[in-house]
């Protein structure tokens, strides 16, 4: 254990995803060795993120405006909505250059052991979005692109039950080919592009 602010910094860094105690310690001592101006830039960026970044009112993507750039782009096909778990998954799909629709971010996946149920996800917003015809366009297809792991598959199954009886709506799931237990964000562009192109109809 170190004293005072140094240990506080290590503790806070250790709360970040994928950062263990040793990594937190290395990052902390790196920060102690850089120029004060570098620290000032980092804290300035963090303050801008805290104060200026919000979630898109339509899809839940990160944005610095009420609507993200994708929901604001009239060239995107508003009738097709790809459902993902997190904003980072949008970037994974965008890298494929295979999808020209819009997105809906759930904010996670069903995980009862961690206390995450349907009410903790943006499922109500999805149903409202389909029913209210955003931008006067009917949503005719939703593509479920949750992660190919236990939580993602459970979420996909739940979504199918909620969506399958909506008239005029086709529910599809990205095709197999992604490694089971993996995360969408780590899939290469070719594999994910093929999974999108080969999506299967569920309802």
From Swiss-Prot:
Q: Care to name a GO molecular-function term for this sequence? A: zinc ion binding
Q: Tell me the domain of life.
A: Bacteria
Name one process (GO BP) from the record. Answer: DNA repair
ZnF locations on chain (C4-type) = 56-71
Give one Pfam family: Toprim_4
Residue limits of the Toprim domain? 79-179
Gene3D superfamilies from the UniProt entry: 3.30.60.80, 3.40.1360.10, 6.10.250.240, RecR Domain 1
What keywords appear on the UniProt entry?
Answer: DNA damage, DNA recombination, DNA repair, Metal-binding, Zinc, Zinc-finger
Q: List the disulfide bonds.
A: none
Tell me the protein family, please.
Belongs to the RecR family.
Q: Which PANTHER family match?
A: RECOMBINATION PROTEIN RECR
Q: NCBIfam families per the record?
A: recR
Q: What does this protein do?
A: May play a role in DNA repair. It seems to be involved in an RecBC-independent recombinational process of DNA repair. It may act with RecF and RecO.
Q: What is this protein called?
A: Recombination protein RecR
Q: Which organism is it from?
A: Mycobacterium tuberculosis (strain ATCC 25177 / H37Ra)
Gene field: recR
């Amino acid at each position: 254990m170190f004293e005072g602010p140094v240990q506080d910094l290590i503790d806070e860094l250790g709360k970040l995803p994928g950062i263990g105690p040793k990594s937190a310690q290395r990052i902390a001592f790196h920060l102690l060795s850089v120029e004060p101006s570098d620290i000032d830039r980092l804290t300035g960026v963090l303050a801008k993120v805290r104060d200026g970044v919000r979630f898109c009112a339509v899809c839940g993507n990160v944005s610095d405006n009420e609507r993200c750039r994708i929901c604001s782009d009239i060239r995107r096909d508003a009738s097709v909505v790809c459902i993902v778990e997190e904003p980072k998954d949008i970037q994974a799909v965008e890298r494929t250059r295979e999808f020209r629709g819009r997105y809906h971010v759930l904010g996670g996946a069903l995980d009862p052991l961690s206390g995450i149920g349907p009410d903790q996800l943006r499922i109500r917003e999805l149903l409202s979005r389909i029913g209210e015809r955003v931008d006067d366009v009917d949503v005719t297809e939703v593509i479920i692109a949750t992660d190919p792991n236990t939580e993602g598959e459970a979420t996909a199954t739940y979504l199918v039950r909620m969506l399958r009886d909506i008239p005029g709506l086709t529910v599809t799931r990205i095709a197999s080919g992604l490694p089971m237990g993996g995360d969408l964000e780590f899939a290469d562009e070719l594999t994910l592009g093929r999974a999108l192109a080969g999506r299967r109809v569920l309802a």
